[in-house]
Curated annotation (Swiss-Prot):
Signal peptide: none annotated. Residues 123-155, 177-205 form the 4Fe-4S ferredoxin-type domain. Keywords: 2Fe-2S, 4Fe-4S, Iron, Iron-sulfur, Metal-binding, Repeat. InterPro entries: 2Fe-2S_ferredoxin-like_sf (IPR036010), 2Fe-2S_ferredoxin-type (IPR001041), 2Fe2S_fd_BS (IPR006058), 4Fe4S_Fe-S-bd (IPR017896), 4Fe4S_Fe_S_CS (IPR017900), Beta-grasp_dom_sf (IPR012675), Cys_rich_dom (IPR004017), Helical_ferredxn (IPR009051). One of its GO terms (cellular component) is plasma membrane. Belongs to the succinate dehydrogenase/fumarate reductase iron-sulfur protein family. This is Uncharacterized iron-sulfur protein MJ0092. Residues 2-84 form the 2Fe-2S ferredoxin-type domain. Gene3D superfamilies: 3.10.20.30, Alpha-helical ferredoxin. It comes from the Archaea.
Length: 489
């Protein structure tokens, strides 16, 4: 027997109850066992028992899961889905969801009915097949950071709109509805994709495609055009403030005993804002036996434009970088920006080179014996690294290898900067950032480490605002993992 805990609600107060249940059964079976053997009368929803109806979704150890397909574990905590009004025990109020579905017209709309029988081409049906796989479990809504702080309805609503927007029979302008339903509030953190039991890629298959369609029809965020102007003028998404990194460094930095030769993709912020981070990266790579080639004519990866629907600029930048990096004789291209790495890996389909995050490279060539560093730190998982590239073990392996460094792990949560939200919807970005800042301060650390210049900037700003608003004396530093390593090699 093992022990699990269930969060109860009797209509007036919440409380926790623990029960012993058999091993090797599902959470749904455990709840039924508890009601039968303990007469607990826990209320919950369930129907198909086969992961098809979505009704049994609950929060398990902090993550939304289907009770019918999740095995019980000792110490497991079961709660109702977060982000919804709780009616009783594990039952949440789904009524607002269904009303909103009707509000966005989740049905095929024809304005001009065909006179003859239409033949659906299999290719078009297949394109939308993934979007039709939703089982309405509402897991994605329960974890969406934008929905939590704004009137953005959430991922599954955008999936519904995309489902019809890309159906050639529908004639309702779903991209316009998406625009007015605040599709640009989405940070593209892909937490919705991570928790979806049907593995629907809502970010790439729905959000970004709807944004591209909306942009083509003139529905966009005005501030995103400023970023567009920057890249068309400077080949960077930000304006130059001091001498760029690419004008400060050499073309090649050889390692003494070369284990690997890489091309360094700097990204916009490291080139134009965080030049010292770029220099630290070169120093750290060389110290680990990695020679560094630095192409001076590289440009923005295009991530801000892929994410915000500006496909024309994104494709133009991609072509430029492919022409540069496809010619290089290196083992791989290394990035120190989560957004750049995710874009190169996932959007550069025509590339002839392998892309690796710097933490991948360092753990593969072998970590050094680092100098001790007395510091209490936590790590922020950039969304485009953890979910965009499936990299989360390597940074932790590096941090845990530094002697005397006290590492406090916290929940992986979006900082609010991505998906064009920091530039286009700063108020939304700040609200999400405030939540992240609170978690970091609650960890009582000296510094937060990350592997994304964009996260670094936004978390630093969020911590500063949180400190001032709450009159906190403690200062928490924010740094890229390469800058931390530069201190201990």
């Amino acid at each position: 027997m093992i022990k699990i805990t269930v969060k109860r609600f009797n209509g007036e107060k919440e409380y926790l109850e623990s029960y012993e249940v058999p091993e090797n059964i599902t959470v749904l079976e455990a709840l039924e066992y508890i009601n039968k053997h303990y007469e607990a009368n826990i209320l919950f929803r369930a129907s198909c028992r086969n992961a098809q109806c979505g009704s049994c979704a609950v929060t398990i150890n902090g993550e939304p899961r289907l009770a019918c397909e999740t095995k019980v574990e000792d110490g497991m905590i079961i709660e109702p889905l977060r982000g919804f009004k709780v009616i009783r025990d594990l039952i949440v109020d789904r009524e607002p969801y269904y009303k909103k579905l009707l509000g966005i017209k989740n049905y095929l709309i024809r304005k001009n009915y065909p006179e003859e029988l239409e033949i659906l081409i299999p290719k078009y049906v297949e394109e939308n097949k993934e979007l039709r796989g939703c089982i309405d479990c509402l897991s994605c809504l329960s974890v969406c950071p934008a929905r939590e702080v704004s009137d953005y309805p959430g991922p599954t609503f955008m999936r519904q709109l995309a489902r019809f927007a890309f159906d050639k029979r529908d004639e309702d302008g779903r991209e316009i509805t998406a625009y007015f339903e605040n599709i640009y509030n989405c940070t593209t953190c892909a937490k919705c994709v991570e928790v979806c039991p049907k593995e629907i890629d809502i970010v790439h298959r729905a959000i970004e495609k709807l944004r591209a369609l909306a942009f083509s029809k003139g529905y966009y965020i005005e501030n995103h055009l400023k970023v567009r102007e920057n890249v068309l003028k400077y080949n960077r998404s930000v304006v130059e403030e001091e001498l760029p990194l690419l004008k400060q460094v050499a073309d090649f930095y050889p390692a003494e005993s070369e284990k690997l030769r890489v091309a360094f993709f700097t990204g916009c912020l490291v080139d134009f804002r965080l030049q010292n981070v770029g220099k630290d990266a070169i120093k750290v790579l060389n110290a680990h036996g990695v020679s560094v080639v630095i192409p001076k004519n590289q440009v923005c990866c295009g991530s801000p434009f892929f994410r915000t629907g500006q496909r024309d600029v994104a494709e133009m930048l991609k072509r430029k970088n492919l022409e540069i990096f496809n010619k290089l004789d290196v083992d791989c291209v290394v990035t120190i920006c989560a957004g750049c790495g995710s874009t190169l890996k996932n959007d550069y389909k025509e590339r002839k080179f392998e892309v690796k995050d710097i933490t991948e490279v360092l753990t593969e060539v072998g970590l050094l014996k680092y100098k001790p560093l007395k510091m209490r730190i936590t790590y922020h998982d950039p969304c485009h690294l953890r979910r965009g590239q499936k990299i989360y073990k390597q940074p932790r392996e590096i941090l845990k290898s530094i002697p005397e460094l006290e590492f406090i792990d916290i929940e992986a949560r979006c900082c609010g900067a991505g998906g064009g939200v920091r530039s286009g919807k700063p108020d939304i970005a700040n609200l999400i950032g405030k939540s992240r800042a609170r978690m970091i301060y609650d960890a009582n650390v000296d510094a937060v480490i990350t592997v994304c210049p964009f996260c670094e900037y936004h978390i630093r700003d969020s911590l500063k605002r949180f400190k001032e608003e709450n009159k906190i004396d403690k200062e928490i530093d924010v740094m890229n993992i390469v800058s931390l390593l530069a201190k201990v090699i």
